[in-house]
């Protein structure tokens, strides 16, 4: 039985999927902890409390009554970060990051995050060319968004064995960035990715990125920058217009996950294919 105050923005399958108590089964602390962990991982409840009491009945004196009380958290969160940077090339200026999160955007614990960042720097006389302050200022503006599902969303990853003991997430990410460097260049970049993070045991974690795309393009350059690139072909390669698809897999084995140990051992393996490798396969 589910009792709630209307309106409630929660899909019908969310609670049954994350509550591991079943009528007629033997009660265990592990089941209670698993239920609390599942509900807490959704990120939509401020508090989750489980109360277990014996039934006041002579007929079913061997049974327990389980009551779960959950309080919804505020779905929207906003953050603002401000900073000031001073660099060795005499550039100084402020930076600002504004972020907003919706912790239950589709009613199933999905988290939508949007972050806007910007910075502006100007050059003081101490490090400027010919002892004069630069007439051109350095700035950077970026917009990044991500959508996180607290479960595996069917797609590029094969169907995993059904398990609710460990967390699993699917993330979609999109971003764009504009960078201006005085006396050198103005460059724009775009990126997008899809990734899966899940655990198959208490110690083994997996991160699969079947698709990631990065695109960079120089909008304009100065004569000084072009001359430097001609003199340094190796550096010039990193500034060419690039369209880079990639895929990656990371396996992490952590002996301390879920418990306290004196000696912690972490082993991580990562494999990635990008650029020319993918081009060779398609050709």
Summary of predicted features, one role per range:
Residues 1, 7-10, 127-283:
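Transmembrane beta-strand segments of outer-membrane beta-barrel domains in Gram-negative
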Residues 1-86, 99, 117, 122, ...:
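Periplasmic polypeptide-binding modules associated with outer-membrane biogenesis and secretion
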Residues 16, 34, 63-65, 77-79, ...:
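Transmembrane beta-barrel architecture of outer membranes
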Residues 19, 52, 76-88, 96-98, ...:
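Transmembrane beta-strand segments that form the barrel wall of outer-membrane beta-barrel proteins
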Residues 24, 48, 109-110, 156, ...:
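Secondary-structure boundary/capping residues
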Residues 31-33, 50-53, 67-68, 80-83, ...:
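Composition- and surface-driven signal marking solvent-exposed, interaction-prone regions
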Residues 41-46, 70-76, 102-111, 154, ...:
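Secondary-structure transition/capping motifs at alpha-helix termini
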Residues 57-60, 87-91, 106-108, 182-184, ...:
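Short glycine/serine/proline-enriched coil/turn segments at secondary-structure junctions
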């Amino acid at each position: 039985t589910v009792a709630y105050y209307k309106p409630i923005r929660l899909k019908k399958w969310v609670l049954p999927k994350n509550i591991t108590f079943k009528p007629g089964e033997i009660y265990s602390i592990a089941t209670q902890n698993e239920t609390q962990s599942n509900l807490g991982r959704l990120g939509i409840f401020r508090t989750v409390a489980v109360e277990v009491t014996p039934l006041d009945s002579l007929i079913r004196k061997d049974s327990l009554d389980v009551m779960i009380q959950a309080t919804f958290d505020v779905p929207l969160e906003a953050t603002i970060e401000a900073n000031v940077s001073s660099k060795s090339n005499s550039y100084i200026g402020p930076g600002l990051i504004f972020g907003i999160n919706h912790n239950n955007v589709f009613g199933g614990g999905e988290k939508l995050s949007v972050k806007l960042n910007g910075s502006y720097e100007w050059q003081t006389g101490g490090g400027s060319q010919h002892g004069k302050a630069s007439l051109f200022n350095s700035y950077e503006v970026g917009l990044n968004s991500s959508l996180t599902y607290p479960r595996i969303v069917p797609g590029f990853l094969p169907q995993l064995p059904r398990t609710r003991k460990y967390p699993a997430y699917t993330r979609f990410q999109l971003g764009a960035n504009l960078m201006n460097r005085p006396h050198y260049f103005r460059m724009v970049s775009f990126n997008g990715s899809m990734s899966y993070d899940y655990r198959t045991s208490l110690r083994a974690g997996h991160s699969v990125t079947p698709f990631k795309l990065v695109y960079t393009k120089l909008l304009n350059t100065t004569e000084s920058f072009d001359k430097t690139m001609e003199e340094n072909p190796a550096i010039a390669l990193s500034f060419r217009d690039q369209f880079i698809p990639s895929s990656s897999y990371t396996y992490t084995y952590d002996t301390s996950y879920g418990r306290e140990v004196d000696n912690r051992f972490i082993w991580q393996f990562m494999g990635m294919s990008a650029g020319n490798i993918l081009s060779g396969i398609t050709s």
